Design a protein with these regions (language model features):
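N-terminal "mature-chain" segments and other terminal, solvent-exposed stretches
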Residues: 17-99, 113, 121, 125-130
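Internal, hydrophobic beta-strand segments that form the core of beta-sheet-rich folds
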Residues: 181-212, 217, 221
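Exoplasmic/lumenal beta-rich domain surfaces
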Residues: 128-183
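Extracellular Ig-like/FN3 beta-sandwich strand-entry sites
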Residues: 100-102, 115, 198-200
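Intrinsic-disorder/low-complexity, polar/charged segments enriched in Ser/Thr/Lys/Arg/Asp/Glu/Gln
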Residues: 102-104, 177-179, 215
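Fungal secretory targeting signals
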Residues: 1-24, 238-244
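Short beta-strand elements
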Residues: 213-244
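Short edge beta-strand/loop segments characteristic of extracellular beta-sandwich folds
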Residues: 104-110
Length: 244
């Protein structure tokens, strides 16, 4: 009976269970945002991986200097137009970064394979062309080794048996937040336009776990470019973004 139960678990359990995501990023000159495709409080912290991982971005390559915005299980391929969704969650003002300033925020480790260390690369065109981007210096790092972190002590007999048999990978729910911070080089300018918002850069933050990699993409602006006429002032009524 136990063997049959374990076989049933093999059928219904995902084989790759690992995730970490960018919950919020703030600029040193103000403003904040979430990563593209983040769904907010409707996604629980603890629980089954199939429920807790739906808005975690997975990238195709472990090399941080690779193009693309990644994808989530909840919404499929990430798109720049999802910035409207991020603004609806976080407010009208994107992270504003001063010259030689920083971005900081929260990296949420969902499961044990979604940990640090993480890296960040900035795309000044706001299109996801990260292969041509600029690496950011890490100021505050997310804990972990090769994208892994120690699992919680409490694990069910059911899960221990599945792990021992090699049926599922060793990725238990962690549900913990960790601070992260990156330095943006002096002289950085943003040329992207997303949903009518000008002067936008995209920043990819991700670990290098081969099961993923996992992380997220956030939009930022350089405060000196925005000035007194804030290009992030938009309306999100009816789920649409308009210039204010």
């Amino acid at each position: 009976m136990l063997f049959k139960a374990l076989l049933f678990s093999l059928i219904v359990s995902p084989l790759v269970t690992a995730h970490g995501k960018v919950s919020v990023i703030t600029g040193d000159a103000g403003g904040n945002t979430t990563a593209l495709a983040i769904q907010g409080g409707i996604v629980p912290g603890p629980g089954k991986n199939s429920v807790t991982e739906v808005d975690t971005t997975v990238f195709r390559k472990t090399n941080i200097l690779s193009d693309g915005l990644g994808r989530t299980t909840g919404q499929g391929a990430n798109k720049v137009k999802m910035l409207a969704q991020a603004i609806a969650l976080s407010g009208d003002t994107l992270p504003q970064v001063s010259d030689n300033g920083t971005i900081s925020g929260v990296f949420h480790i969902v499961t044990t394979d979604g940990a640090g260390p993480v890296k960040a690369v900035l795309d000044p065109t706001g299109t996801g062309a990260f292969s041509q981007g600029t690496m950011l210096r890490t100021v505050t790092q997310v804990p972990g080794k090769h994208g892994n972190i120690a699992a919680p002590q409490q694990r069910s007999l059911h899960m221990r048996a599945l792990v021992a048999m090699g049926i599922v990978k060793r990725a238990a729910n962690v549900n913990e937040d960790f601070p992260v911070e990156f330095s943006v080089p002096a002289g950085t300018t943003c040329s992207g336009t997303i949903n009518g918002i000008n002067n936008v850069c995209l920043v990819k933050i991700a670990n290098s776990n081969k099961a993923g990699p996992f992380g997220g993409v956030v939009a930022i602006q350089m405060a000196s470019q925005v000035g007194s006429n804030n290009d992030t002032a938009v309306s999100t009524k009816c789920g649409r973004a308009f210039i204010a």
